[in-house]
């Protein structure tokens, strides 16, 4: 008897996944050390889904730089210590028969918030409490009362170049960390979404002003990441702007 399509293997760019039941990326806000390094908690979390039989496990939104984190308690891939910790997790998932991708992202103007756990009261974490000044396509804060009045730095040419380099470097680190695929986070009102949406990107230079300008950064990031890794690459754009 043929198994249902859901439980049949799927091969994409040379990566064979054991079935089509995939775990989507879900932010955990569980790095209490606030250094971006995943812990034993993450090992158990992702390992349990591999034991449960998921095909591709997509690790949570992982920042390409410290200032790209949604909260100070997010994971990252900007240094070697993070690579080593992730490698322990990817090795475990592979030993359990699973495959694992990582969602690389930058929160942009929605960065430096409290962790979104039960009891979250909203608000941006200020620099004096371990936060930082977020960046965005303009100096306008994100929508929502938790962001009201919080300062944002508009990215200049050097800042945009750094964003592209950060994605490229993080993707290279993802390969060393043992990830089988990379997802570029382009949704949910985070930085790349902020650039391609006309609601948040009101720039008048070559990184805005019209459609081609607004999609320039997401495409540049995709090109940089594609050139840095040999494995499967995909992205997650947003179909609506309600999360900006």
Where are these regions (language model features)?
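Structural preference for long, well-ordered alpha-helical segments within the folded cores
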Residues: 48, 92, 166-173, 181, ...
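Alpha-helix-loop-beta-strand connector modules within alpha/beta enzyme cores
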Residues: 79-96, 202-233
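Active-site beta-loop-alpha junctions enriched in small/polar residues
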Residues: 26-28, 105-107, 187-189, 240
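N-terminal capping/small domains of soluble enzymes
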Residues: 2-105, 114
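Non-globular sequence segments
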Residues: 105-177
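Polysaccharide-binding and catalytic clefts of secreted carbohydrate-active enzymes
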Residues: 154-155, 162, 183-219
